UniProtKB/Swiss-Prot annotation:
The gene is lolB. It comes from the Bacteria. Disulfide bonds: none annotated. Monomer. It is a lipid-anchor. Residues 1-21 form the signal peptide. This is Outer-membrane lipoprotein LolB. Pfam families: LolB. Plays a critical role in the incorporation of lipoproteins in the outer membrane after they are released by the LolA protein. It comes from Salmonella schwarzengrund (strain CVM19633).
Length: 207
């Protein structure tokens, strides 16, 4: 099916709320070495998670468009996950269901699309070049394929720099939710030039 010129609703009334909620505080204390055993242990604990879910605020900001929404992210197994974006009234703007070899997306008109690559599909449908394949690792506080990254004073990821498809993504973590074990990111910002993606996680459920 030919992909339309689809755009999420610009939820501008949420702008101040989301931008305030996603403001990243400065890091305190010196960073730790990526070779430290504490960091290796933290990575191992996160990678052992089979199922998890989180919800919160999403913002995409560029010179061409601004998108604000609520999001729900759920992983039910290896390479099986669901991403939901909703407006303030709770109506679905986008629902993505992915499993190995098959990705399905439903837009706010109920139109269904299928593809092999979730990242490419979202980019074409929404105009937002979200690095979804890498974000699946970054949202957990893991560097993924990136080798240029820094840790905070608690041996957790604080910054990632990664070049992908001609884009230079910088990921900055503003804090972690220590109520979960292991601690999971509480908010983060991705940037590439004038593009910014902000995520604020309200809570995590991990298994």
């Amino acid at each position: 099916m030919t992909l339309p010129d689809f755009r999420l609703i610009r939820l501008l009334p949420l702008a101040s709320l989301v931008l305030t909620a996603c403001t990243l505080p400065g890091h305190e204390g010196p960073g730790k070495s990526p070779d430290s055993p504490q960091w290796r242990q933290h990575q191992q604990e996160v990678r052992h998670l089979n199922q998890y879910q989180t919800r919160g605020a999403f913002a995409y900001i560029s010179d061409d468009q601004k998108v604000y929404a609520r999001f729900f992210w759920q992983q039910t197994g290896q390479d099986r996950y669901r991403l939901l974006l909703t407006n303030p009234l709770g109506s679905t703007e986008l629902e993505l269901n992915a499993q190995p070899g098959n990705v399905q997306l439903v837009d706010n008109k109920g139109q269904r699309y299928t593809a092999d690559d979730a990242e490419e599909m979202i980019g074409k449908l929404t105009g937002m070049p979200i690095p979804l394949n890498s974000l699946r690792q970054w949202i957990l506080g893991l560097p993924g394929d990136a080798t240029d990254y820094k840790l905070d004073d608690q041996y957790r990821l604080s910054e990632v720099n990664y070049r992908q498809d001609g884009k230079n993504w910088k990921v900055v973590y503003g804090g972690y939710d220590s109520k979960t074990q292991p601690a999971m990111p509480a908010n983060m910002e991705l940037s590439d030039g004038s593009q910014r993606i902000k995520l604020k996680m309200d809570n995590w459920i991990v298994k």
